[in-house]
Amino acid sequence: MAPEEDSLALAEAWNHGFGFIKTSIVKTAVELEIPDILESRGAPVSIPELATAVDCSADRIYRVMRFLAYHGIFKRTKPPPESTEGGSVYYAQTPVSRRLTRENLGPFVLLQGTMREPSGCVTAETLRTSKRPGVVNENESDHLYEDPVFSMKVFRDAMASHARMTTAAVIENYGEGFQGVGSLVDVGGSYGMALSMLVKAFPWLRGICFDLPEVVARASPLKGVEFVGGTMFESIPKADVVMLMFVLHNWSDEECVEILKRCKDAVSKDKGKVIIIDAVIDEDGDGDEFTGARLGLDVTMMATMFEGRERTYVEWARIINEAGFRRHVVKNIKTLESVIEAYP
């Protein structure tokens, strides 16, 4: 190996050694609401001003911002002409940091550090035993989810953030898929946030949010959304279209086939369809700019769910065909997930 190649390899190895720091510091910036502060100011902010806003040491905030600017999260800029702090360092938003505000993916980033213990990481034990580290009984719930702050705030906000971003992409890039659709069932729709966004964007839809009885019992009324309790392994309310958003990646292939069969029973054979919104991994690992995130999500599912996984085109085709659908189409919606249309 040439000296230059060896030096690059060593640098890359060091970067992996400190790889966890990037996510940790991004999470810290979100906790301090730095992206929101910069967004609200609408102009570059000096380190002293930022330190005052977040009630932290200016030196420490500078070092954090220097690190994040190196990684392209924020950008260092020149002082604005009207500045009275000529010697201060200024930082501004980037397209990435705008995606880290509270109204974007900020809440999802806040989830990450909390899931490292006991069962949020892929470890040697995970790979050898197919069990989550720190969880003794497969039927035992993760103690993390028993924490009301985590389950009712951190986890719920993260899932809502993810669903909000993906639903916005569906509305923007898959609007034609809802033309001529009268009724739509959102299976596993929780409290109906995603469905309410779709009904607002496509007001001709009659939305049915279908989830476990104990979930829909806690849901607040939403315009254009009817809540129905039940289990997707038994039966699903009939509609023109059945939607599964972030559902099938939680389950084994066998369970997915059973869920899809129930979905198939709920739609018309002539005009109905099932919409699956989940990640589709490219066979050769290339793909688009979201491939790294999809692969990351897949190994996260391996750590947090016993049978959860993201699937390739071939793997999706296998379970869709086995469930009895005659054809399916995969559509790119310019985000982490794709839309898969399955026709009975």
UniProtKB/Swiss-Prot annotation:
Q: Name one GO biological process term.
A: methylation
Name the enzyme's class.
Answer: transferase
Q: Which UniProt keywords apply?
A: Methyltransferase, S-adenosyl-L-methionine, Transferase
Task: Identify the Gene3D superfamilies for this entry.
Answer: Vaccinia Virus protein VP39, Winged helix-like DNA-binding domain superfamily/Winged helix DNA-binding domain
Record pathway:
Flavonoid metabolism
Give the EC number(s) listed in the UniProt record.
2.1.1.-, 2.1.1.232
UniProt keyword Cytoplasm present:
no
Under Pfam families, the record lists: Dimerisation, Methyltransf_2
Write out the GO MF terms.
O-methyltransferase activity; protein dimerization activity
Catalytic residues (UniProt): H249 (proton acceptor)
Give the catalytic activity.
Answer: apigenin + S-adenosyl-L-methionine = genkwanin + S-adenosyl-L-homocysteine + H(+); luteolin + S-adenosyl-L-methionine = luteolin 7-methyl ether + S-adenosyl-L-homocysteine + H(+); quercetin + S-adenosyl-L-methionine = rhamnetin + S-adenosyl-L-homocysteine + H(+); (2S)-naringenin + S-adenosyl-L-methionine = (2S)-sakuranetin + S-adenosyl-L-homocysteine + H(+)
Q: Record's InterPro entries?
A: COMT-like (IPR016461), O_MeTrfase_dom (IPR001077), Plant_O-MeTrfase_dimerisation (IPR012967), SAM-dependent_MTases_sf (IPR029063), WH-like_DNA-bd_sf (IPR036388), WH_DNA-bd_sf (IPR036390)
Q: Which residues bind S-adenosyl-L-methionine?
A: D211
Described by its record, this protein's role is as follows: Flavonoid 7-O-methyltransferase involved in the biosynthesis of polymethoxylated flavonoids natural products such as pebrellin, aroma compounds which contribute to the flavor of peppermint, and exhibit pharmacological activities such as anti-allergic, anti-oxidant, antibacterial, anti-proliferative, and anti-inflammatory effects.
Q: How does it assemble?
A: Homodimer.
> What is stated as this protein's family in its record?
Belongs to the class I-like SAM-binding methyltransferase superfamily. Cation-independent O-methyltransferase family.
Q: Which PANTHER family match?
A: O-METHYLTRANSFERASE
Q: What is the name listed in the Swiss-Prot or TrEMBL entry for this protein?
A: Flavonoid 7-O-methyltransferase 1A
